[in-house]
A protein has these predicted regions:
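Extended, charge-enriched "interface" segments that sit outside catalytic cores
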Residues: 40-212, 228
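Cofactor-binding active-site loop characterized by glycine-rich and histidine/acidic residues
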Residues: 229-394, 398, 607-660
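Active-site pocket-lining segments that scaffold enzyme catalytic pockets across diverse folds
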Residues: 189, 193-253, 563, 575-589, ...
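Subset of Sec-pathway N-terminal targeting signals
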Residues: 1-40, 44
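Alpha-helix capping and helix-loop boundary segments enriched in small/acidic/polar residues
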Residues: 6-9, 60, 203-210, 292-303, ...
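Glycine- and acidic
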Residues: 1-4, 15-19, 195-207, 229-230, ...
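Flexible, glycine-rich loop/tail regions that form catalytic "lids" or insertion modules at the edges
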Residues: 64-74, 78-116, 130-133, 154, ...
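Conserved phosphate-handling catalytic cores of large alpha/beta enzymes
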Residues: 372-383, 391-427, 432-437, 445
C-alpha cells in the first residue's frame, strides 16, 4: 500500500492550513506532522537528489501543488515588501529570488486550477490567478509589510487578518477622503506660503513628505477614540513648522513672528531657531474628545529628543494615569539617515520592554527622503532598510509610498491599532523625497543631479490626490482651488497680525506642570535653604530602613549590613553615605514626594553600598524598605537598574523630570567619568534648555568618583 495513500482521502484544505501553520510556527505542529513537512521541504530543496525526488513524488500531485501554493503565500508574507510600489521617485532595487511561479515548482498552466490554500487568507478556495492577484494587492502595492520575524502567534494572526481585509486597501468614506485632502492641502499650502513670503529662509520644509500631516491627524483623532488623553511627540527639524501649525495648533502668527526675527519678550533668554521650539496645546477632536498635545523641544542633534519623549510619556503615565498605557501615546518622527546612522534609536528601542522605561509601545514614523543632507541612502547604511532597528524588538514595519495619501493614513491607523492592542512598538517608513536641498538655500543638484531633475517634474501629493478625487466625482477642480484659497487667506490674516507684534514670545513647554514654580534667578540659587526635618520623622524612617521583614530569609551579609546601619543611627554619631542617602529619600517620601533613581546597577549600587532594593535569599522576592515607611500615606520610591546605556537613559530621566517637577528624579553614572557617554544630553538639554526654550528641569545627576 502507498505509504501516503491516506493523503488522497483527506481534505487538502486541512493539510494546507496545517502546512501554513508549520511554516510560520514549526513547533506548534504535532511532531509526526512536523517530521512529514520537514521531509517534504527537504525533498523540494534537494530535488536534484534521486532519493529526494522519490520522497516528494510519492506525495499525491494535487497535494504537492497545494503545498507549493502555501509556500508561495508564505514567500509573499516574508518577501513581498521587497517588490512593492512604495518609492515615488526611484526605481526599486532588484532582489532575488523573486516571486515568480517557477521558483515554487508552479507554472502558468496552474493558474486556472482551484486551490484550497485560499482559505488561509480568508478568500476561500480560489484559482491561482485570484490568489496571486490578492497577494499582490496585499503585499506588493503601496504598502509593504515586514512582520514574519514576529514569534508570537497571536500577533501574527492579528496582523494577517488585518492585512487580508479588503486586500489591505483603504476603504474611506467620501467625507473621510475630503478630510484627507483638506489636511494635505494645509500641508502643501503652508510650505508654498512660507516659500513665497520668506524666500531663502531656512524652514526645512516637508515638501515631498506632506502626507505626514494627514497621517498624524488621523492618529490623533483615532487615538482619542481609543481613550488616549496625552499625545507626546518628538521630531527633528524636517516638517516641524508644518506639524506645529497643522497638527498642534500653533498659530501662523506665532510662526511668522519667529521668521521675522523679532527680539524676545524677555531678554534673559537667548532663544533658539523656530524649528527647535516645543509646544503644548489642548485639542478637541471631531468626536468631541479632549486630548493634550505635546511636542518636545529638541536641539540640532538628531534622535536625542526620542529618549526625552519616552521619559515624558512614562512620567505622565505614572503621575496622571496610574500606569495605564492606553492613556498616553508617544510618537517619534525620525529621518531616514538619522535612525539608521545614530546609535540612540537602538538604545531607545532596547528600553521598550524594560520595567523601568516602558511606555506601552511607541509609534515610530520615518520621514524617508532617501538622502542624508547630501549622502545617498546606499552610503548611509548597510542594512536593507533604514528601519531595520525595529527587528530588535520584533516590531512590525510598514513601508508606504508617501504619494499615496490614503495608503499612508491606512497604514498609520493599522500601526495605532497594533500599538493599542499589544502595547508594543510599530514602525512606519514613509518613502518620499525632499523637494529642495537639506535646507532651502542648499543646491541638491551638486550631488543628486539626476534625481532632482525627476523631482522637479513630480506632482505634489495634494495634486495627485486631488486628481484622484476629481476622477471619482467626490470633489471638483473648483473645490480644490477654493480649499487652497481659503487656507492661504487664513495665513495672510495671521501674517498681517504677526506684523503688529513687537516681540517674539517663547511659550514654555508643558507650562501647566510647572505652574507655580518660578524660574530661579542667580541670587535665588545661592540662598541657604533650611532642609532640617523633625527628629521623630527621621527616627521613624531610620527604624523602617533598618528593619528586615521577620518572615523573610536574607543573606547573612545583608543582615549584617542592615544591622550596621541600625547601629549607625541609634548607637553612634557617624553615618556613611548610603545611610545618609536613604534617610534623605525616606524623609522626602514621608512628606509625600516621589523619588525615582535609575542608572547602571543603582539598586545595589556599583560599590555595593546602596542596597535600596533587597532580595529574599530563597524566593528572590524584591523588598524595598523605603516603600514601607507609611504605605498608605507616602510618596513612591522607584529604583531601576538601567540597560548599559548612558545617553538614552539620561535622556529618558531628563524627560521624566521635565514632566515631574514635584518629584526627585536622579540619574546615576556608574562612575563619574562614564557620564560623558551622555555628553550631548548635558550640552544640549541640562546646561542649555532653560536659556533656549524657557524649559525648567529638576534632574539630579550623581557622579560617583566624579570631577
Amino acid at each position: 500500500m502507498d505509504k501516503y495513500s491516506f493523503l488522497n482521502a483527506a481534505h487538502t484544505g486541512y493539510f494546507a492550513q496545517m502546512y501554513d501553520q508549520y511554516l510560520q510556527q514549526p513547533d506548534s505542529v504535532e511532531p509526526s506532522w512536523r517530521a512529514f513537512f520537514q521531509g517534504f521541504d527537504f525533498g523540494v530543496e534537494n530535488s536534484q537528489d534521486d532519493n529526494s525526488i522519490e520522497s516528494v513524488t510519492e506525495v499525491p500531485e494535487h497535494l504537492q501543488k497545494e503545498f507549493r501554493v502555501v509556500q508561495l503565500i508564505d514567500a509573499y508574507r516574508k518577501r513581498g515588501h521587497l517588490f512593492t510600489k512604495t518609492n515615488p521617485v526611484r526605481d526599486r532595487r532588484t532582489y532575488q529570488p523573486n516571486l515568480a511561479l517557477e521558483n515554487f515548482g508552479l507554472s502558468p498552466a496552474d493558474r486556472n486550477m482551484v486551490f484550497n490554500a485560499g482559505d488561509i487568507m480568508g478568500i476561500g478556495p480560489n484559482t491561482l490567478t485570484v490568489i496571486i492577484e490578492h497577494l499582490e494587492r496585499v503585499y506588493c502595492n503601496s504598502i509593504g509589510v515586514e512582520y514574519m520575524y514576529i514569534r508570537n502567534p497571536e500577533k501574527l494572526d492579528w496582523i494577517q487578518k488585518r492585512l487580508h481585509v479588503n486586500d489591505n486597501l483603504p476603504n474611506f468614506s467620501q467625507d473621510e477622503k475630503k478630510h484627507i485632502l483638506k489636511k494635505l492641502n494645509q500641508a502643501v499650502s503652508f510650505e508654498t506660503f512660507l516659500h513665497t513670503k520668506y524666500v531663502g529662509q531656512k524652514r526645512f520644509s516637508l515638501e515631498g513628505g506632506e502626507s505626514l500631516i494627514p497621517a498624524l491627524d488621523a492618529v490623533v483623532e483615532a487615538a482619542a477614540n481609543h481613550g488616549v488623553e496625552e499625545f507626546v511627540m518628538g521630531m527633528a527639524h524636517r516638517g516641524r513648522l508644518n506639524t506645529l501649525t497643522n497638527i498642534f495648533g500653533k498659530s501662523g502668527k506665532d510662526i511668522f513672528s519667529e521668521f521675522d526675527g523679532k527680539d524676545y519678550e524677555e531678554t534673559v533668554f537667548d532663544g533658539d531657531v523656530k524649528y527647535h521650539l516645543g509646544w503644548t496645546s489642548k485639542r478637541t477632536t471631531d468626536n468631541g474628545k479632549k486630548i493634550n498635545m505635546n511636542i518636545a523641544p529638541n536641539p540640532s542633534h538628531l534622535e536625542t529628543v526620542g529618549a526625552v519623549v519616552q521619559g515624558i510619556a512614562r512620567a505622565k503615565l505614572e503621575n496622571s494615569f496610574d500606569g495605564d498605557t492606553h492613556k498616553v501615546l508617544p510618537i517619534i518622527v525620525h529621518g531616514d539617515a538619522a535612525i539608521a546612522g545614530q546609535g540612540l534609536p537602538y538604545e531607545i528601542v532596547q528600553m521598550a520592554g524594560l520595567k523601568g522605561y516602558g511606555t506601552g509601545g511607541t509609534i515610530h514614523i520615518v520621514v524617508n527622503n532617501q538622502i542624508g543632507f547630501t549622502t545617498n541612502y546606499l552610503d548611509a547604511r548597510s542594512s536593507t532598510y533604514c528601519t531595520d532597528v525595529a527587528k530588535v524588538t520584533l516590531s512590525p514595519v510598514l513601508h508606504v509610498n508617501s504619494d499615496d495619501a490614503e495608503a499612508v493614513v491606512h497604514a498609520t491607523l493599522f500601526a495605532l491599532d497594533y500599538r493599542m492592542k499589544f502595547g508594543r512598538d510599530v514602525f512606519i517608513d514613509l518613502l518620499g523625497y525632499r523637494k529642495y536641498g537639506h535646507n532651502e538655500g542648499d543646491e541638491p543638484r551638486f550631488t543628486q543631479p539626476k534625481l532632482y531633475k525627476k523631482i522637479a517634474k513630480h506632482q505634489n501629493p495634494r495634486d495627485i490626490y486631488a486628481d484622484q478625487l476629481i476622477a471619482q466625482n467626490i470633489v471638483t477642480a473648483a473645490d480644490v482651488k477654493q480649499l487652497e484659497l481659503d487656507y492661504k487667506n487664513s495665513l495672510e490674516v495671521d501674517l498681517k497680525d504677526s506684523r503688529k507684534e513687537e516681540k517674539t514670545i517663547i511659550t514654555p513647554f508643558m507650562a501647566d506642570e510647572w505652574e507655580g514654580l518660578s524660574l530661579a534667578k542667580a541670587k535665588k540659587m545661592k540662598e541657604v535653604v533650611d532642609t532640617k526635618v523633625d527628629k521623630k520623622m527621621l527616627t521613624e524612617v531610620a527604624t523602617t530602613i533598618t528593619t528586615l521583614p521577620a518572615d523573610k530569609k536574607f543573606l547573612r551579609k545583608i543582615e549584617k549590613l542592615i544591622g550596621d546601619r541600625r547601629r549607625m543611627y541609634f548607637e553612634s554619631d557617624a553615618m556613611d553615605w548610603a545611610m545618609g542617602e536613604l534617610l534623605a529619600y525616606g524623609t522626602l517620601l514621608k512628606e509625600g514626594f516621589d523619588v525615582r533613581i535609575s542608572g547602571q546597577d543603582v539598586e545595589r549600587g556599583t560599590f555595593s553600598h546602596r542596597h535600596a532594593l533587597l532580595k529574599a535569599e530563597e524566593s528572590e522576592e524584591e523588598i524595598v524598605l523605603l516603600n514601607t515607611i507609611s504605605p498608605e500615606n507616602q510618596g513612591k520610591f522607584s529604583v531601576y537598574n538601567s540597560l548599559l546605556s548612558e545617553y538614552a537613559v539620561l535622556g529618558f530621566d531628563y524627560g521624566f523630570a521635565m514632566a515631574s517637577p514635584n518629584a526627585l528624579t536622579i540619574w546615576e553614572a556608574q562612575f563619574g567619568d562614564f557620564s560623558n557617554g551622555a555628553q550631548i544630553m548635558f550640552d544640549q538639554y541640562i546646561s542649555a534648555a532653560e536659556d533656549k526654550w524657557k524649559a525648567q528641569n529638576g534632574i539630579v545627576v550623581l557622579l560617583p568618583h566624579g570631577y
